[in-house]
């Protein structure tokens, strides 16, 4: 059994911060669960262009508001508490938080914990290609 406390995780190197977001990685590849689980905050006013070419992601919004735009269709969906979106086709998208948005996310395959988005908006497929994260405050 794995039991972890979010407050404790936020004080470790499992708490990764990058432009527009901070992510507490609660479960990682080394935990052997077959997925990773993150509690991520998307910062108000940011525009997060992402394209997970090597991972599938599902996200549940817990707090905050904003929008997500599907770049293939142009559709824009409202984000608010209780809304879930799943990037089941490696969807290119932009998240625009109006307020800080708190989310719970799962990734398959699991991330190692070091990943931050590359220039294409993806996490690298090979963990050895992952850049070192910027420490969170």
From Swiss-Prot:
Sorted alphabetically, the keyword list is:
Lyase
Give the record's GO biological process terms.
ectoine biosynthetic process
Signal sequence region: none
* Principal EC category: lyase
Q: What is its EC number?
A: 4.2.1.108
Residue numbers spanned by region Disordered: 115-137
Pathway the protein contributes to = Amine and polyamine biosynthesis; ectoine biosynthesis; L-ectoine from L-aspartate 4-semialdehyde: step 3/3
Catalytic reaction(s) noted: (2S)-4-acetamido-2-aminobutanoate = L-ectoine + H2O
| Protein name, UniProt field | L-ectoine synthase
Recorded source organism is: Sphingopyxis alaskensis (strain DSM 13593 / LMG 18877 / RB2256)
This protein's gene is called ectC
């Amino acid at each position: 059994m794995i039991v972890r406390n979010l407050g404790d995780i936020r004080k470790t190197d499992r708490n990764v911060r990058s432009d527009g977001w901070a992510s507490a990685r609660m479960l990682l590849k080394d935990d052997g669960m077959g997925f990773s689980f993150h509690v991520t905050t998307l910062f108000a006013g940011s525009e997060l262009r992402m394209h997970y070419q090597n991972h599938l992601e599902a996200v549940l919004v817990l707090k905050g508001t904003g929008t997500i735009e599907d770049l293939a269709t142009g559709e824009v969906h409202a984000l608010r508490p209780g809304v879930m979106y799943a990037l089941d086709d490696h969807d290119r998208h932009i998240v625009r938080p109006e307020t800080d948005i708190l989310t719970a996310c799962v990734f398959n395959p699991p991330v190692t914990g070091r990943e931050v988005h590359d220039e294409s908006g993806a996490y690298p497929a090979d963990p050895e290609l992952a850049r070192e994260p910027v420490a969170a405050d």
